[in-house]
Regions:
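Phosphate/oxyanion-binding loops and surfaces in catalytic or ligand/nucleic-acid-binding neighborhoods
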Residues: 10, 14, 27, 31, ...
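Short, charge-rich amphipathic segments
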Residues: 2, 24-36, 76-77, 87-94
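Hydrophobic alpha-helical connector segments
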Residues: 1-18, 62-69
Length: 106
């Protein structure tokens, strides 16, 4: 959980990482190499990592829960980018993660 919040901060607040993420989002359509990097860093790579973590934590339906967990994280990158009140979005993101984790514990 703490790691996911740190990754969100990294991909949204770090100047280099945020610019890199935005560049990959655009360039994925122009180059197979950029598409592969986009998938590796922002889509299938993180989703697979979360799934593996959930398997090791013996969370039920690790693949389904990983998709639910990471999809929310991924969408919040874009919400954050377009928000006037970025602190509010970050808080909403953290609350959403807490809620998902609580639901998975049940």
């Amino acid at each position: 959980m703490k790691y996911s919040k740190s990754m969100f901060e990294y991909w949204t607040e770090d100047d280099f990482a945020s610019s890199f993420r935005k560049m990959l989002t655009i360039e994925q359509f122009r180059s197979e190499e950029m598409q592969n990097l986009y998938q590796q860093y922002l889509v299938s790579g993180p989703a697979e990592y979360v799934k593996d973590l959930f398997k090791n934590m013996e969370i039920k339906n690790p693949e389904e829960n990983a998709v639910k967990f990471y999809a929310n994280m991924f969408i919040y990158y874009s919400v954050y980018d377009g928000a006037a009140d970025k602190a509010k979005v970050k808080c909403q993101f953290e609350q959403m993660l807490d809620k998902i984790v609580e639901e998975m514990k049940q």
